[in-house]
């Protein structure tokens, strides 16, 4: 297991989360002069993205994230994204949050599987950050935060060997190995089978630095080529045009990690059979996790670096629906297995007083306070924002 995997996992999943939220917010946009108080506008969309990106790329948070450390469970990471998604005026209910996380994880899993070389997972990360910068081009302060993260990625990962990147890729694949959630977009494009497994292509560019398959060279004991044999590989491969840029700015060449929701095609984000395809999640929820204390320590370090700005004034939150209709969202909530509901685990950690206080402070921010019900569709049940740390 690589101790350099966590930043790549977090940044790429975060990028996919922002793509999905941006697409759904755009789909629900109403011109500002025509919008009611309970409807989304372009100003609201930009505010939500700015708030989430600013929180995600907070300097202290990034410092903790880039420290060498093991990956933790899906549940621990999901908790971070759930708080991150609610770092602004937006509200997602449990069914929509489930769907959002499913789409994030399956999209990045697909990208990792299709990376031509293990090192190219870094290009995928750069593609995510390049697109994120497009969301905040009018916010120079936040743009500087993202650029600083890009510099950190270049410094830390630029000198890693091919073997180290292979270990990172294997660590990511192990993390995703039990996730086979069907996504209609992938099913439509025939890149995913009905069992939730992805289809690996037998065409397209080969990895940079390699040759198109179809030729076997034979050498003697002196290293001299003595024979060539051609064979049919059954695919339609072509040489790679050029290597993607690993610099702060440049042509990444690789398209994996770009915003697949921005193309002109019907974006269907329906997740099929999520209640059946989360067996590993169910097991984690039924049985108390023996690493729960370590996961909370991990969250304390990560979340301790997050600075969440409280909304000023009694402003209602905006409800965002990740489903096509409210009825579909309600149905997903009803069919959600009870085992996936969060349960409170009491942990005695008295040996480290400072860490105990830190955990208590962080977990206190996870508490949800009662909000008065509003008649607006985007203002009810707003999750309480985490206090600024």
UniProtKB/Swiss-Prot annotation:
Its main location: membrane. The keyword Lipid metabolism does not apply. GO terms for molecular function: transmembrane transporter activity. It holds the Pfam family Oscp1. GO terms for biological process: xenobiotic detoxification by transmembrane export across the plasma membrane. InterPro entries: OSCP1. The keyword Transcription does not apply. Expressed predominantly in testis, also found in placenta and to a lesser extent in thymus and small intestine; abundantly expressed in tumor-derived cell lines. Ubiquitously expressed. Keywords: Cell membrane, Membrane, Transport. GO terms for cellular component: basal plasma membrane; cytoplasm; plasma membrane. It is found in: Basal cell membrane. May be involved in drug clearance in the placenta. May be involved in the development and/or progression of nosopharyngeal carcinoma. This is Protein OSCP1.
